[in-house]
Amino acid sequence: MDRPEDRRLETRSSANVRGLIVTPGLELPCLIVDQSNSGVRLRLDRNLALPNRILLIDIAQATAVEAEVAWRKGQEAGVKRTGAASSLRGLVPSRLAAARAALIRAGGR
């Protein structure tokens, strides 16, 4: 049986790393399944509604990136990066203070 044509403009690489979605009033663990330069596919523990804009933390890399939710299907979501990744190590700008605190609570450094 033929596989459906992949219409992505960029190739995705497998990641399988722990992530954390942070929005005002929400910290949601997730798995970063795969990623490209412009987007990330996430797997969530629960089927919760997400706001359009999120802050996605890569726990292993201790980085955060602003993103927009592009699609949702069950417990998976695709997000489009809307900014560059910022380090959460050391001093961080005030806009990332909540993300740094969430990273520490999740066991990141």
Locate predicted features.
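Structured alpha-helical
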Residues: M1-R109
